[in-house]
Amino acid sequence: MDLLHKNMKHLWFFLLLVAAPRWVLSQVQLQQWGAGLLKPSETLSLTCAVYGGSFSGYYWSWIRQPPGKGLEWIGEINHSGSTNYNPSLKSRVTISVDTSKNQFSLKLSSVTAADTAVYYCAR
């Protein structure tokens, strides 16, 4: 086993969250939370809560930005649970909704270093 593969076995990486996790979109505020440090092959879980506006009538999205790269759309969900996913991530992504709490969640399975990014929830 070469040194690179040996080091990859023990690789930890950061899935960065927004430094200021609550921000305002019009009168709607979104607050997200979740694990920021994972080992390869683990599952990333993030949740976003919507405050101060209507939850129904919109699609709620997850977007990410890898270091030094542009934004990448992950997927979206509406209040009734209808989803759309980025085809390149679809096999590993699940987005769910909890209308009783005005929250929606992202799960990304089998993460690798290529999934290192700033993850955003958005309307």
Curated annotation (Swiss-Prot):
SMART domains, alphabetized: IGv (SM00406)
List of glycosylated residues: 78
GO biological process, one term: immune response
Keywords: Adaptive immunity, Cell membrane, Disulfide bond, Glycoprotein, Immunity, Immunoglobulin, Immunoglobulin domain, Membrane, Secreted, Signal
GO molecular function, one term: antigen binding
Signal peptide boundaries: 1-26
Gene3D superfamilies on file: Immunoglobulins
Region (Complementarity-determining-2): 77-83
Domain annotation Ig-like: ranges: 27-123
Region (Framework-3): 84-121
Annotated stretches, region: V region: 26-123
GO cellular component annotations of the record: extracellular region; immunoglobulin complex; plasma membrane
Region (Framework-2): 60-76
Region described as Framework-1: 27-51
Cell compartment(s), UniProt: Secreted; Cell membrane
Region span, Complementarity-determining-3: 122-123
Subunit field text: Immunoglobulins are composed of two identical heavy chains and two identical light chains; disulfide-linked.
Function, in words: V region of the variable domain of immunoglobulin heavy chains that participates in the antigen recognition. Immunoglobulins, also known as antibodies, are membrane-bound or secreted glycoproteins produced by B lymphocytes. In the recognition phase of humoral immunity, the membrane-bound immunoglobulins serve as receptors which, upon binding of a specific antigen, trigger the clonal expansion and differentiation of B lymphocytes into immunoglobulins-secreting plasma cells.
Annotated protein name in UniProt: Immunoglobulin heavy variable 4-34
Lineage summary: Eukaryota, Metazoa, Chordata, Craniata, Vertebrata
